[in-house]
Regions:
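Cell-envelope/extracellular polymer assembly enzymes that use nucleotide-activated donors
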Residues: 3-5
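A conserved acidic beta->alpha catalytic loop
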Residues: 35-43
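Conserved donor nucleotide-binding strand/loop of the catalytic core
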Residues: 45-71
Length: 84
């Protein structure tokens, strides 16, 4: 599964994101977490894990997805929810 990246938009998910990222440790996948600039708590939760963190440039779920997808370097990607 090294050819896949999970794109995880995470807006105000500081409680649920660590649970999801702990479960994902079982798999050999890359992870891109897209966080709004003003969401410091989710950033602090995410930075403890092996993942790429991107701060969202524009508001909205679609914008977060687009920005995350454009950052993917693997052959495949999957959209994954931060709340499990």
């Amino acid at each position: 599964m090294k050819d896949i990246t999970l794109v995880i938009p995470a807006k105000f998910e500081s409680d649920s994101l660590p649970k999801v990222l702990n479960e994902l440790k079982k798999f050999s996948v890359k992870k891109i977490i897209v966080i709004p600039k003003n969401d410091i708590l989710t950033f602090k939760s995410a930075k403890k894990y092996d993942c790429k963190i991107i701060f969202q440039k524009k508001n909205g779920y679609g914008s977060a997805l687009r920005q995350g997808i454009l950052s993917v370097k693997t052959k495949y990607f999957c959209i994954f929810n931060a709340d499990g």
